[in-house]
Amino acid sequence: MEYGQQGQRGHGRTGHVDQYGNPVGGVEHGTGGMRHGTGTTGGMGQLGEHGGAGMGGGQFQPAREEHKTGGILHRSGSSSSSSSEDDGMGGRRKKGIKEKIKEKLPGGHKDDQHATATTGGAYGQQGHTGSAYGQQGHTGGAYATGTEGTGEKKGIMDKIKEKLPGQH
């Protein structure tokens, strides 16, 4: 092995990559150790006596090669939101950013009115008539007046006021 080329075996090979673009098969990685002939030790990218650049840290760094995967996108599939939705006429249309955000927020579906009359709000606070948090001594009946059987959603302020003591 020449001086200045320690830990550089295998970096000249190209084309030996797996399906994700990672190098495979006999590629050894250097550690960026001592470089003879320069009078210095260690360091990334220092030139040896013969002009070989040192790669430190034991990491493979390809020189601006693009790895194509044949047009196949590898996705995790963990997200449930889609960038398009049914347009009602058998086709699809792209969703806007606003629609994507509304889809992820709890209770943000204005088109879905089927669950509001039976289950209450987003966190089930609508039908409770008993004593609220930390309010001992109150007998129920004073908390959900006005929205009990109408199927209307309570506003955020109404929910907060309901939980405050002495505000009825």
Swiss-Prot record:
Region (3 X approximate repeats): 2-140
Gene Ontology terms describing biological process: cold acclimation; response to abscisic acid; response to water deprivation
Residues in Sequence repeats: 2-10, 94-107, 122-130, 132-140, 153-166
Biased segments, Gly residues type: 23-59
Biased composition, class Low complexity, residue ranges: 115-147
Region (2 X approximate repeats) location: 94-166
Region (Disordered) location: 1-154
Top-level division of the source organism's lineage: Eukaryota
Single GO cellular component term: vesicle membrane
GO molecular function, one term: lipid binding
Keywords attached to this entry: Phosphoprotein, Repeat, Stress response
Expression induction: By abscisic acid (ABA) and water stress.
PTMs per UniProt: Phosphorylated on serines in the serine-cluster region (poly-Ser).
Basic and acidic residues biased stretches: 98-114
Protein family: Belongs to the plant dehydrin family.
Protein name from the UniProt record: Dehydrin DHN1
Phylogenetic lineage: Eukaryota, Viridiplantae, Streptophyta, Embryophyta, Tracheophyta
Gene: DHN1
